[in-house]
């Protein structure tokens, strides 16, 4: 059995919705969690502390500004959104350095996205496309047919640059189809 790569990881969770923070705390109970519900408190924590990762809401807490801080400090960030779910925010998050872009409807798999990110980083894969491969059918259903056509250059470069590895699935015995709430 694989050891839990999340155990003891320092994770900053940022969201303006208390129920989202509580849900994430429950999902990531093996991690050392800190939370922030405003831009100001999150900015202060990001600038003064060291984290293994940050999970950032896009809308209510100026997530893109926080992503820039996290990227500058080399803190891997996963973007979490409901109201900001759009092709533009998805590509914008990646351009600013986000390691993943997770719709809030997929919140119950946040541990999988984090485990995958940490495992692949250990293997030297900094630009993983696994999260996108897992969520591509969701994005296709949500954004509609041809949604990537608006930014063909970006998505073509993404496909060339971001690696997809089966290492995570083998290590954690995760099926390609995970259960999601929509």
Q: Whereabouts are the PLM-identified features?
A:
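Two-component/phosphorelay signaling modules centered on CheY-like receiver
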Residues: 18-35
